Amino acid sequence: NRGQRAFVLTLQAREQHIRRQKATSNICSNQSLMALFVTMYCSLMGRQGLKEAAGLSYAGAHYLCEQLVATGHFTVVYDRPFFNEFVVRYDGDVDALQRRFVEGGFFGGVKVAPDQLMFAVTEKRTKEEIDKLVELV
């Protein structure tokens, strides 16, 4: 003990946390493991860190949405408040756009309809990265 904080799952079957393809039983939900990850993240970030991460996610998503609409190729599908995820309609070939994003080093949204993409922005994305993604449009 060096006075360092540690997190463990006590009395957990190891098989619960291996890949589903390799498991020999159906106990693969990983709920306990995900709960541990959330606990670790929240405790490491602290109250102020969580608030900052949420603010960065919100600001980044709204900035990306505004920039995409400003290209003239996107319209917002749901005209409602959002946190860090939003859906836009693209006036071009969505599959070709996604290929450009991948070639540029981005996972550029989830295709939710033939002409629609859902984007999510987290605190890890910078303004420069968002601008680079928009340039690929």
Feature roles, as predicted:
Residues N1-G72, V76-D79:
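Active-site C-terminal subdomain of aminotransferase-like
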Residues Q48-K132:
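Conserved C-terminal alpha-helix-loop-beta "cap" of PLP-dependent enzymes
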Residues L136-V137:
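C-terminal alpha-helix
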